[in-house]
């Protein structure tokens, strides 16, 4: 699964996901992409599950680009532990996705296969998505 090699700080603030994506809203590599339509925190496991679903449907033909990276540590307190006594330990890694962000791109497969693969991948994500195609495709 994806996670940073090193980070400046072990734990991060929860924060809020405000506004639309400032960058990463155009297709850069592939012909088809999966675009987020709402703000959400996507975990490393969800990214990996989506990648697997897409590559399996494409039967390892073509190419997949993951345009998001889980760089935010999410901490969690153990079960049945009372409130207080500090922040919990980092449990998993997540990526804050803003609306308009292209999360996955694929190329090298026919349009119908690409759309089916991206629909299967979208089912693994907690975000409402839209399939986008490069103009002239």
UniProtKB/Swiss-Prot annotation:
The processes (GO biological process) annotated in the record are: translation
Q: Which family does it belong to?
A: Belongs to the universal ribosomal protein uL16 family.
HAMAP family this protein is in? Ribosomal_uL16
- Tell me, what does this protein do in biology? Binds 23S rRNA and is also seen to make contacts with the A and possibly P site tRNAs.
Signal sequence extent: none
A Pfam family the protein falls into: Ribosomal_L16
Which cellular component terms (GO) are annotated to the entry? cytosolic large ribosomal subunit
A GO molecular-function annotation:
rRNA binding
What InterPro entries does the annotation carry?
Ribosomal_uL16 (IPR047873), Ribosomal_uL16_bact-type (IPR000114), Ribosomal_uL16_CS (IPR020798), Ribosomal_uL16_dom (IPR016180), Ribosomal_uL16_sf (IPR036920)
Q: Which UniProt keywords apply?
A: Ribonucleoprotein, Ribosomal protein, RNA-binding, rRNA-binding, tRNA-binding
- Which proteins does it associate with, and in what oligomeric form? Part of the 50S ribosomal subunit.
Name it. Answer: Large ribosomal subunit protein uL16
């Amino acid at each position: 699964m994806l996670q940073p090699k090193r980070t400046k700080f072990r734990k991060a603030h929860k924060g809020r996901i405000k506004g639309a994506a400032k960058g990463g809203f155009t297709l850069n590599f592939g012909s088809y992409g999966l675009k987020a339509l709402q703000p959400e925190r996507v975990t490393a496991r969800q990214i990996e599950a989506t990648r697997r679903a897409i590559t399996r449907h494409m039967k390892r033909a073509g190419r997949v680009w993951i345009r998001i990276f889980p760089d935010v540590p999410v901490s969690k307190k153990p079960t049945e532990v009372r409130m207080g006594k500090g922040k919990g330990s980092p449990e998993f890694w997540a990526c804050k996705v803003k609306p308009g962000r292209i999360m996955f791109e694929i190329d090298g497969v026919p349009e119908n296969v690409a759309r089916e693969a991206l629909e299967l991948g979208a089912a693994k994500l907690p975000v409402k998505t839209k399939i986008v195609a490069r103009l002239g495709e």
